[in-house]
């Protein structure tokens, strides 16, 4: 089977009802990013940070995978698929995808404030006083602004091995994820799917599809299945 790597961003989940923080109506409106998604914000006002992520975690139980999520899961019948997602939701998992690398962490995980390897699955609200086994406060298992991306090397390795790369639902503005495609082989076929794809300044060998994730995947699926054989 050929290696198919997906780099997914907030746009694919937006079609399930999860707001994106770079759009005008996004979750970050009314919030200073550094106040709710940085080590500085956590140190300054941990309760505010917990409230913010508790709200986002609750929202997960009100949304469902869309046809684009399901199409990517379906491709596992035809390719060795690896999904590298910038999203912290679990919609790829619920759609049926089996190999998912969460570059920026997961809403349904929390970790020790002191030890990033002490990670727990967490579906309820997280409160001050909820402690890890090392007696430190639990925090969202999210890669905040200013923090290193621990899975970046693994993501780069996957992109290097890709025969086909699909970039879907990302504005390619959040680094280092935005530069991942540059690690692809010169022979790798690359599709970029986004409603504003044509506005992106990308190499000419990247095929831009100026559509939403759902519409683009519906159109592209027959071709992808044909190319797999």
Please report, for each region that a protein language model flagged, where it lies by residue.
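Conserved catalytic core of sirtuin-type NAD+-dependent deacylases
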Residues: 1-229
């Amino acid at each position: 089977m050929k290696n198919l790597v997906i780099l997914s961003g907030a746009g694919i989940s937006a079609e399930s009802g999860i707001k994106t923080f770079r759009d005008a109506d996004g979750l970050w409106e009314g919030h200073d990013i550094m106040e709710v998604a940085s080590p500085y914000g956590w140190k300054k006002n941990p309760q505010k940070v917990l409230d913010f992520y508790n709200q986002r975690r609750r929202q997960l139980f009100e949304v469902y995978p869309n046809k684009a999520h399901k199409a990517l899961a379906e491709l596992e019948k035809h390719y060795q698929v690896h999904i590298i997602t910038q999203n912290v939701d679990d919609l790829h998992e619920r759609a049926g995808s089996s190999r998912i690398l969460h570059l920026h962490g997961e809403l349904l995980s929390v970790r020790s404030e002191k030890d990033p390897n002490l990670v727990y699955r967490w579906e309820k609200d997280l409160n001050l006083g909820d402690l890890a086994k090392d007696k430190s406060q639990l925090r969202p298992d999210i890669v905040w602004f200013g923090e290193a991306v621990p899975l970046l090397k693994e993501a780069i390795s996957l992109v290097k091995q890709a025969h086909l790369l699909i970039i879907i639902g990302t504005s390619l503005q959040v680094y280092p994820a935005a530069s991942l495609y540059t690690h692809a082989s010169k022979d790798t076929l690359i599709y970029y799917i986004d409603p504003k794809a044509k506005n992106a300044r990308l190499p000419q060998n990247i095929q831009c599809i100026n559509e939403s994730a759902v519409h683009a995947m519906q159109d592209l699926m027959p071709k992808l299945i044909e190319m797999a054989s």
